[in-house]
């Protein structure tokens, strides 16, 4: 499925499937993270150290989530972004208020967490800590 542009983000929650349908289209690791709110192993993700120009999309539904221009090396062991494409993610506070869960606004797939106020020299001082397995990447020169 081709990645969607920010202007083409479908309505929130509009891409729903039953677990058996998700299992048929996702790898076991993608299902564990996206649907069961799992976490990649620290430092092992495909996109942790990737800084090529392009767009990161949801591995579940193809919705464009992050531009590479918002990616930075936080040293946390997971891909880190300081901002998402407008309307592409949902943020839900977790108990204790230290972090917010982030999910795809279209398919509700678990992406990771947002941490605020950690002192990064980024425009937002936010760290969107995202599981690599939740993402697909399209380089700026590709047709997707």
UniProtKB/Swiss-Prot annotation:
Q: Domain of life here?
A: Eukaryota
The active site is formed by: 129
Show where the MsrB domain sits: 19-140
MF-aspect GO terms: metal ion binding; peptide-methionine (R)-S-oxide reductase activity
- Tell me the compartments it is located in: Cytoplasm, Cytosol
What cofactor(s) does the depicted protein rely on? Zn(2+)
Question: What is the catalytic activity of this protein?
Answer: L-methionyl-[protein] + [thioredoxin]-disulfide + H2O = L-methionyl-(R)-S-oxide-[protein] + [thioredoxin]-dithiol
The set of disulfide-linked cysteines is 76-129
Q: Which GO terms describe its biological process?
A: protein repair; response to singlet oxygen
Query: For this protein, what does the record note about how its cofactor is bound?
Result: Binds 1 zinc ion per subunit.
Q: What class of enzyme is it?
A: oxidoreductase
> Where along this sequence does the record place binding of Zn(2+)?
58, 61, 104, 107
Q: What is its EC number?
A: 1.8.4.12
What Pfam families does its record include? Answer: SelR (PF01641)
> What is any one of the record's Gene Ontology cellular component terms?
cytosol
Keyword annotations:
Cytoplasm, Disulfide bond, Electron transport, Metal-binding, Oxidoreductase, Redox-active center, Transport, Zinc
- The keyword tRNA-binding is assigned to this record: no
Q: Which InterPro entries match?
A: Met_Sox_Rdtase_MsrB (IPR028427), Met_Sox_Rdtase_MsrB_dom (IPR002579), Mss4-like_sf (IPR011057)
Chief location of this protein within or outside the cell: cytoplasm
Record family assignment: Belongs to the MsrB Met sulfoxide reductase family.
The free-text function statement in the UniProt record for this protein reads: Catalyzes the reduction of methionine sulfoxide (MetSO) to methionine in proteins. Plays a protective role against oxidative stress by restoring activity to proteins that have been inactivated by methionine oxidation. MSRB family specifically reduces the MetSO R-enantiomer.
Protein name, entry field:
Peptide methionine sulfoxide reductase B7
What organism is this sequence from? Arabidopsis thaliana (Mouse-ear cress)
């Amino acid at each position: 499925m081709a990645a969607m542009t920010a202007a083409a983000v479908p309505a929130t929650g509009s891409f729903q499937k039953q677990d058996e349908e998700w299992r048929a289209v996702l790898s076991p690791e993608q299902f564990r993270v996206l649907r069961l709110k799992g976490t990649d192993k620290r430092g092992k993700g495909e996109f942790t150290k990737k800084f090529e120009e392009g767009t990161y999309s949801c591995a579940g539904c193809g919705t464009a989530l992050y531009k590479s221009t918002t990616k930075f090396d936080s040293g946390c062991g997971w891909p880190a972004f300081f901002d998402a494409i407008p309307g592409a993610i949902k943020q839900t506070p977790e108990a204790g208020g230290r972090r917010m869960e982030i999910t795809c606004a279209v398919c509700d797939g678990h992406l990771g967490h947002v941490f605020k106020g950690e002192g990064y020299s980024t425009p937002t001082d936010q760290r969107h800590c995202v599981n690599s397995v939740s993402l697909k990447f399209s380089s700026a020169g590709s047709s997707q």
